[in-house]
Amino acid sequence: MAAAHTEDLELRTSIAIAFARSPMVAANMSWDLQRASNGNFTLGLGSQVKGHTVRRFSVPWSAPAPRMREYVQAIRAIWDCWKNDTPLDYQGEHYQFSLMTPNFTPEPLNGELPKIQIAAVGPAMMKVAAEECDGVMLHAFCTRKYLDEVILP
């Protein structure tokens, strides 16, 4: 992988569908990619629409913004466990994590944790991005007018 041989190349997922996989899986994948890219990995997450969430991925539907908030918080709790040897104890409505054994703790990172960005179209997900994430990715249809009238207020 080219990112392993330079510090100038950023590696990111763009928008990976979050709810189709456990936050534990996303945390582990991101940790490994952060190590492999010399600390230049950004995890991009999106919620996907109800039809795909339920019928394509067979995941129960719930309001995406509160669930995405928990998803990001759970990933950060898992990373904190691995980086700082903090006991894992994340208890949310959608995700609960309380078990981490040494056999499943990845090798340490030599630097910062990965960044997290989420896809957002409306105000609720923008609020999650502002409060929990390192960045936001807007949909291609987000015109300046939409940004001014819907997302920013």
Give the positions of each predicted feature.
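Active-site-adjacent structural elements that line small-molecule/cofactor binding pockets in enzymes
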Residues: 1-153
